[in-house]
Regions:
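Phospho-regulated, low-complexity intrinsically disordered regions of nuclear gene-regulatory
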Residues: 1-19, 41-121, 155, 159
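Alpha-helix N-cap and coil->helix boundary residues
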Residues: 26-27, 45-46, 125, 144
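Short capping segments at the starts of secondary-structure elements
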Residues: 17-27
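Residues within the alpha-helical elements of helix-turn-helix
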Residues: 34, 38
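Short interaction-prone segments
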Residues: 121-152
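Alpha-helix boundary/capping and short turn/kink residues
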Residues: 21-22, 40-44, 139-142
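Onset of an N-terminal alpha helix
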Residues: 2-9, 28, 126-130
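A short acidic, leucine-rich amphipathic alpha-helix
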Residues: 30-32
Length: 160
């Protein structure tokens, strides 16, 4: 059975997640190397799918897959509902079980029952990310937001 390069990229990433459950994400090279070891495949399309074609937040060019999440520069993990998605991406999130060898179908089951139900990575809401975001807010708007927060803190809960 010939496996689509997008499915190879997803399967290699899923295998890494299962083999390293404490790892949040993996380098592009780690995923490519895992795909090569598993599938003995050197098709350049696998690399392109890891880098761009399967990344949900990227503009589709041409693929619309939502199989991977770009968690940081040069890092990927499997996509989870709630991750950022480019509005033009409507493609598949995981391989069709009938299109992959039987020995990998349990990875799709694991993804659906466990992985996809976990919340998106906490790294996206880390203090450093929030501080970087706050740094983008104009000072005037930041003062208004701070005042609104202070006003809300003075609300008497007995009034509700």
């Amino acid at each position: 059975m010939s496996i689509l390069v997008a499915d190879e990229a997803w399967l290699a990433t899923a295998l890494l997640h299962r083999e390293h459950p404490d790892a949040e994400d993996f380098s592009l090279d780690d995923i490519r190397d895992r795909a090569r070891r598993e599938f003995h495949d050197n098709r350049p399309g696998v690399w392109q799918h890891i880098v761009s074609h399967c990344v949900a937040s990227n503009r589709p060019n041409p693929a619309q897959y939502r199989m991977l999440h770009g968690s940081a520069r040069g890092r990927r993990r499997l996509y989870r509902p709630g991750d950022p998605v480019h509005p033009e991406r409507k493609g598949k999130i995981y391989p069709d079980k009938s299109a992959i060898p039987e020995r990998y179908r349990n990875l799709v089951d694991w993804y659906l029952s466990d992985y996809s139900k976990a919340s998106p990575d906490a790294g996206s809401s880390s203090a450093a990310v929030w501080l970087e975001f706050v740094g983008l807010i104009p000072a005037y708007d930041l003062r208004k937001m701070s005042q609104a927060i202070r006003d809300c803190e003075r609300v008497d809960p007995n009034e509700w």
